[in-house]
């Protein structure tokens, strides 16, 4: 995989460089609530602009239905990128139409432009190879060189991620190079004990990665909504907690395999429960009760790991040589249910080894809860991409950059 440093050494002054970034940031109206993904692409964009390239930044945002939708415009992200660069960033109101052509034509050496949401074109996400290829051909007409730096999208077989690099000289940006280096530390160069903490709502989202980790990790800590399917598989009643009944047979098999492989599978010993899900808008006090994990009342749902579990998980992380954490331990968006996630984050900060926060909700939680991002070994920008890499899958966006 050729990297941006090789491109810079070849010289990029005056060249149109298409940077496939991941500017898929959460929005409240037009206000960006977490700009982590925009900040992550700044080193690549700045290096190219400083070297005199004409930089065209492209990304998706949300899931528009293959047509323009103002709610998913990249305009706020373009404005924020300009603020972070301390430079004017031009914005094209389409992706491959007259606005994009005019904006790209008008770029001076060292200039930066953002084109509108790639998913406003059905060809970006099409399952039809010919439709995707046709859109990639149009994108290729805008640029001379391709730099892949949207790690959060490399697991998608989309036109700008998979088809476009085949049409232009292609290089990995700083973010992708860093992310791949980190994931190699989690797969090929693991320092032990290797501890994995998994949370989040659905156990079905994590089954494939658990399958792989049962042969690699030393300890697996389970929290979040997915923990209740594990507790049910152990024969406990879980009240009205989130439960994926159809996954219980698979989870039972994983519990048995963990025992057979000598992997320590650690489940909550106590949880915070309440009769209903909290109001995340008003953040009104939820007044949860702490109960043992095997004594959840029939009319209550578990919404965070309890104080004993927090201590237990911290102790299991205390000597870790390598840690991968993906998914919050509870409904961290509400202050009454944030302590479990906070405890795991703090345990990662305190752990002596290399710690990775695996993107998505965990990365958002770390920022929301006020942790210093530099206190972790690495905070990934790709939740789904990280998981699929650890599952051993070939990621289309990385495969395209390898060719």
From Swiss-Prot:
Its main location: cytoplasm. PROSITE patterns: PGLYCERATE_KINASE. It is an enzyme of class 2 (transferase). Its EC number is 2.7.2.3. Signal peptide: none annotated. SUPFAM superfamilies: Phosphoglycerate kinase (SSF53748). GO terms for cellular component: cytosol. GO terms for biological process: gluconeogenesis; glycolytic process. Disulfide bonds: none annotated. Belongs to the phosphoglycerate kinase family. This is Phosphoglycerate kinase. It comes from Streptomyces coelicolor (strain ATCC BAA-471 / A3(2) / M145).
């Amino acid at each position: 995989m050729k990297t941006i440093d090789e491109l810079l050494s070849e010289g990029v002054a005056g060249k149109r460089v298409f940077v496939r970034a991941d500017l898929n940031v959460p929005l409240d109206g037009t206000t960006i609530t977490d700009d982590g993904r925009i900040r992550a692409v700044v080193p690549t964009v700045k290096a190219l602009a400083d070297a005199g390239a004409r930089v065209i930044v492209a990304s998706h945002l949300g899931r528009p239905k293959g047509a323009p939708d103002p709610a998913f415009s990249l305009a706020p992200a373009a404005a924020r990128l300009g603020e972070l660069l301390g430079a004017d960033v031009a914005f094209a109101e389409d992706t491959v139409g007259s606005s994009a052509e005019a904006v790209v034509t008008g770029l001076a050496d060292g200039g930066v432009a953002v084109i509108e949401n790639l998913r406003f074109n059905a060809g970006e996400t099409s399952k039809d190879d010919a439709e995707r290829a046709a859109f990639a051909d149009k994108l290729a007409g805008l640029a001379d060189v391709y730099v892949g730096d949207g790690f959060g999208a490399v697991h998608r077989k989309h036109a700008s991620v998979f088809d476009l690099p085949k049409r232009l000289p292609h290089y990995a940006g700083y973010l992708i190079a860093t992310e791949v280096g980190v994931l190699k530390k989690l797969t090929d160069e693991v320092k032990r004990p290797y501890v994995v903490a998994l949370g989040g709502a659905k156990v079905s989202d994590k089954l494939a990665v658990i399958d792989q980790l049962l042969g690699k990790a030393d300890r697996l800590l389970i929290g979040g909504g997915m923990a209740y399917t594990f507790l049910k598989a152990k024969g406990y009643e879980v009240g009205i907690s989130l439960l994926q009944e159809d996954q219980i047979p698979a989870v039972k098999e994983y519990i048995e395999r963990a025992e057979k492989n000598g992997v320590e599978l650690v489940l909550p010993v106590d949880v915070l429960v309440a009769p209903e899900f909290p109001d995340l808008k008003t953040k009104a006090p939820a007044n949860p009760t702490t109960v043992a994990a095997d004594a959840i009342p029939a009319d209550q749902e578990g919404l965070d790991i309890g104080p004993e579990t927090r201590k237990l998980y911290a102790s299991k992380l205390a000597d870790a040589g390598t840690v991968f954490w993906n998914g919050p331990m509870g409904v961290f968006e509400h202050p009454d249910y944030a302590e479990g996630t906070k405890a795991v984050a703090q345990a990662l900060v305190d752990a002596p080894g290399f710690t990775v926060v695996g993107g998505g909700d965990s990365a958002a939680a770390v920022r929301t809860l006020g942790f210093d991002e530099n206190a972790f070994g690495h905070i990934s920008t790709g939740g789904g991409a990280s998981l699929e890499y650890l599952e051993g899958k070939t990621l289309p966006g990385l495969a395209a950059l390898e060719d």
